[in-house]
Amino acid sequence: LQYVTLYGIFYAYEIIFYSGGIILEKLVITGPTPLKGEVEISGAKNAAVALLPATLLIDGVCTITNVPNISDVQILCKILGEMGAKIDWTGKNELKIDTTNITTTQAPLDLTSKFRASYYLIGAMLGRTGKIEVGMPGGCNLGARPIDQHIKGFELLGANVEVGKGTISAKASCLKGAHIYMDVVSVGATINIILASVLAKGTTTIDNAAKEPHIVDVANFLNTMGADIRGAGTDVIKINGVEKLHGNATYSVVPDQ
């Protein structure tokens, strides 16, 4: 039995070893001991990695605060930079992003293949230009971690999606609103369909949508820039397409949960 005092609280924890490895770790907390003080809560990673691609939909500059400076965010910044965006860290956790001059519809394949959330570039670029190619997000196995709900949503909006050897490409001459029923509740697909629908013609309804806080955060961010998204945080989300999103706004990433 091991003992430790942390922030004025007495902890006892027991580690049981079996065959040379730890199979169980147990914490026993003895209280009450009053707590006091402050901690800084970082911005939510799952929101940040969706908000950065969402800036591709904006006509202008935006500032995002409370951005966690983690590897996935750093890779996304590099991807957006190589696509033509101007990105500056203007504070400890503050990014100024200008996506006015995006110069390519092919995201760096080597970088997008490094982490799964790069698939948000597909929805955002379909909305912006109607065309995008990325490396297979995170090197994911389509059987083990399917993105079929993403593809289903894009195709119902009017896009043609092709999965190649290590790449995904999508293009559409005109995205049009549609009713999309999610066969499986998917956070990533819900956000991706929102991104693709914001500038589409007409109304898109996502039925059986995921309801996580970072979905609400993405919707709030886009609405701040002029989108018309309703119902985020419920299982039915409606997106009324608008002509464009404006920049010149500041938004803070929701704190981590």
Regions found by a protein language model. Give the residues of each.
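Structural preference for solvent-exposed beta-strand-turn elements
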Residues: 2-257
